[in-house]
Amino acid sequence: MTRLLQPFVLVVTALLAAAYAYPAARLATGPWERGALAIPFVLIWIVPALYWTGSRDDEESWLDQAAHQASYLSMAWVSFLLVLTLARDILLFAASVLQSERTHAVIAQAGAPAVLVASLLAMACGAATALRGPRVEKIAVRVPGLHPDLQGFRIVQISDLHVGRSIRRGYVERTVERARNLAPDLVALTGDMVDGPVERLAPHVAPLAALAEGGRAFFVLGNHDCYSGADAWIAHWRETGVRVLQNEHVVLRRGAATLLVGGVVDPAYRARRPEISLQDAPSADFRLLLAHNPKLAPLGARAGFDLQLSGHTHGGQFFPWTL
């Protein structure tokens, strides 16, 4: 339990406690209801709190796996519950300001059950979406004046797999199979591939090596890759044939056209400056930047890149988690 005393863990645990306590206090009206509702909320909060502060001696045990799944489901639920509770309270405040007693009474009476049901449904939908596996989304990027030999160039981007206790080898195999079926000219691995050390997760990410055939797969670090041991993972990806870009670039040829692929590291590992990746770069018909964090886009554009591929946001988030 020494991890509990670490400042970061203390802060996260306190924030979790507040996130669970606020809905529990606001959704119950009387003291008996508050007490009855507080018990399950405390129990649900304890699961992730103990999981994140406990031992990591046996991460593959069924008990650890169960605690892991329960903790993430718990936090997913409270992320919806907290936002919906805040929305309900804003509506109550608006009804009070407008002196609409009827509206206030309806929201006060029906709001709590509606919030609980809606948050559980949202969590269930999210879990079902995750269990379905990777989804292919095809996006056509139209580039005025693109060199004819680069027309139809196909890039497959894979990002934020977070291979670890939840995402295992089977999920990675399905991802690789779908990627190969798309017949890509280039594979962009834009960070956060793992959540754990090489010695534990190497067998689970092994299928990704199949995408490196012909030197077409490129990888840039994400923040979670850095937390998981950046140097060890960089060495591992290079051993598999994946080309790791750390504030550097490579130039590919397709017919008479040239494609420059630049990559920047995540700030969790080292300074991120897209212009560094263009140092001593020749002219190219198209410049592609791989960066885990999309906030680098303005810097990338100023540096002279035509397109940036990023991850980090998991396909988009909802307020206030976008702050």
Map each language-model feature to its residues:
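Non-catalytic terminal accessory segments
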Residues: 1-134
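A broad, low-specificity signal marking well-ordered, structured residues that form hydrophobic/aromatic
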Residues: 122, 139, 259
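Alpha-helical transmembrane signal-anchor/signal-peptide segments
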Residues: 133-145
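Soluble catalytic domains of enzymes that build or remodel membrane lipids, polysaccharides, and related
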Residues: 142-323
